[in-house]
Amino acid sequence: MEIMVDFPGGSRVDAHFKSFTVETDQPTENDGQNAAPTPFEVFLASLATCAGFYILGFCKKRGIPYEGIRLVQTMEQDSSTKIVRKVVQKIQLPQGFPEQYISAVKRAADSCLVKKHLEAPPAFEITATVRS
């Protein structure tokens, strides 16, 4: 997959891939207009939505109602480096959710591909060339 990034103005940085555009910005105190999430916020949201996707798929496959299920994600950051040291994902299940599937729905969330990439990170190669 190829992602093309451009700079539409201010502190905006947008990513284009397939037929989608992911818009990002910075808060006003960081020279942005706060018109979109920061790239890091998009990254954190991708962890939560990925886990949610696996929870949804688990429920659909088994015919379990998924209405009322919520996933709440919080992060614990190192105050000096601002690096996230711990991500906590709490799956809130509605009354009547089948007891026998509680552990399995946790395993489904744990299967998230974004999370798997953090557990076995890829190598990065960065180059710079002048276009002709």
Regions found by a protein language model. Name each.
Residues 1-45, 55-132:
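Extended beta-strand/beta-hairpin segments
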